[in-house]
UniProtKB/Swiss-Prot annotation:
Belongs to the neurotoxin 10 (Hwtx-1) family. 29 (Jztx-13) subfamily. This is U10-theraphotoxin-Cg1a 3. It comes from Chilobrachys guangxiensis. Residues 1-21 form the signal peptide. Disulfide bonds join C31-C46, C38-C51, C45-C58. The lineage of its organism: Eukaryota, Metazoa, Ecdysozoa, Arthropoda, Chelicerata. The presence of a 'disulfide through disulfide knot' structurally defines this protein as a knottin. Keywords: Disulfide bond, Ion channel impairing toxin, Knottin, Secreted, Signal, Toxin. The keyword Signal applies. InterPro entries: Huwentoxin-1, Huwentoxin_CS1. GO terms for cellular component: extracellular region. It is found in: Secreted. Residues 22-29 form a propeptide. SUPFAM superfamilies: omega toxin-like (SSF57059).
Length: 66
């Protein structure tokens, strides 16, 4: 029982560390990639992507989109 509790605690700590490292990497980018939040106060979308006015995230450019 004690071992399983320790595994759960260490697993949650590892998950927290990995998600923090991923978030730290994402905030270091200068532009947003696919499905990245965009809009006021957020980085602009990278080349090849547009900010969707409906969903407020970066989507692939399409020929019909302005």
């Amino acid at each position: 029982m004690k071992t399983s509790v320790l595994f759960v605690i260490f697993g949650l700590a590892l998950l927290f560390c990995l998600s923090f490292a991923d978030e730290l990497e994402d905030t270091g980018r200068q532009c947003g990639e696919f499905m990245w939040k965009c809009g006021a106060g957020k980085p602009t979308c990278c080349s090849g992507y547009d900010c969707s006015p409906t969903w407020k995230w970066c989507v692939l450019k399409s020929p019909g989109r302005r």
